[in-house]
């Protein structure tokens, strides 16, 4: 199985092809992208020096271009390892990361600050990060290395963001294909220099990638290669109305919530941002009520009801309370097995299943 057993966590130590993926991706980058970085530094520095004593260009504007040159030099110094670095932001402090995202931020029908500076310095736009590290340069399904091959080798079968949908690989005309999207955790519109970085790629379902996450800034969110909701202590919980619903005392409406109380502020903020960016509160709040009700009824209610219906057939045997309890336990274990496998294999709704069972102190 893959490394997505915990909701939103990708454990690369459990991805058997990870070293092969890193090797192939770094070789592709070194051949196709890296040579252009050297050229970009040379061309940008030349225009920067030409404008160094231009009084019409402010110090602030010169500083923006200078810091972009410094970033490219850092990237160049990593050679083929840049796109497979775990530490995506080098040793940059938060202020520098915020500065880079600010000058590179692209909005509809509006140039970024960096684009404006390129115009002022008369620097060719092909050296802008959106073009230099363009995701479009990474083939979809052609060539020796492409997105579909990467996704297939990762073998992640369930969306790490929501853990609700399968993302499957398949073959078509002897070619590997997948139903997954390859999402950029740090969006291309804010961090274009990370558009080709392996540790910025998150295999995801189309709903999480397109409808919810989009290009929202995720800098202060749960980063799937490092942590999960479980790691930070966030749990699914139900509202108390579910008890009345299961007992059949009244037809109540209950909700599924994500509880993260009593956590430190930094972790709280990460969880809040992740829930908001992915719309997890919306998709889980009521969408899986029937699943939760069936889960609890199957384990807590139906085995006993089933046994009661068998009493007439096994009347003498079932008068022994000890034997009766053993039979009930046996039935419950049979019912639990599919849920146990769901949790162990990281199948859709695995975390939801485990958290709700924990909430009701049901051992699985």
Question: For each of these PLM feature ranges, what is it?
Answer:
Residues 164-200, 214-229:
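Histidine-centered nuclease catalytic patch
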């Amino acid at each position: 199985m893959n490394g997505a057993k915990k909701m939103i966590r990708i454990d690369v130590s459990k991805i058997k092809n990870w070293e092969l993926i890193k090797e192939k991706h770094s070789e592709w980058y070194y051949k196709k992208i890296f040579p252009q970085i050297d050229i970009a530094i040379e061309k940008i520095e030349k225009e920067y020096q030409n404008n160094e004593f231009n009084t019409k260009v402010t110090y602030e504007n010169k500083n923006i271009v200078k810091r972009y040159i410094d970033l490219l030099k850092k990237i160049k110094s990593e050679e083929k390892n840049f796109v497979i670095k775990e530490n995506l932001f080098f040793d940059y402090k938060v202020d520098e990361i915020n500065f880079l995202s600010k000058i590179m931020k692209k909005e509809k029908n509006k140039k970024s600050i960096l684009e404006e500076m390129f115009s002022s310095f008369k620097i060719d736009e092909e050296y802008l990060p959106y073009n230099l590290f363009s995701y479009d340069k990474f083939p979809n399904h052609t060539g020796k290395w492409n997105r579909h091959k990467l996704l297939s080798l990762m073998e992640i079968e369930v969306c790490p963001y929501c853990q609700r949908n399968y993302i499957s690989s398949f073959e078509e005309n002897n070619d590997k294909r997948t139903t997954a999207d390859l999402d950029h955790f740090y969006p291309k519109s804010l961090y274009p220099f990370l558009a080709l970085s392996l540790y910025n790629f998150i295999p995801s379902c189309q709903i999480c990638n397109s409808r919810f996450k989009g290009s929202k800034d995720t800098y202060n969110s749960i980063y799937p290669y490092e942590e999960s909701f479980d790691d930070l202590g966030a749990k699914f919980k139900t509202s108390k109305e579910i008890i009345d619903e299961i007992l059949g005392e009244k037809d109540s409406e209950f909700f599924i919530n994500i509880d993260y109380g009593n956590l430190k502020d930094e972790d709280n903020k990460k969880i809040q941002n992740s829930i908001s960016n992915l719309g997890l509160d919306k998709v889980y709040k009521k969408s899986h009520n029937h699943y939760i009700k069936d889960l609890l009824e199957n384990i807590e209610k139906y085995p006993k009801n089933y046994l009661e219906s068998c009493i007439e057939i096994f009347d003498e045997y079932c008068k022994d309370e000890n034997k009766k309890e053993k039979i009930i336990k046996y039935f419950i274990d049979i019912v639990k097995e599919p849920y146990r496998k769901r949790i162990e294999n990281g199948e859709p709704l695995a975390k939801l299943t485990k958290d709700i069972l924990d909430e009701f102190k049901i051992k699985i």
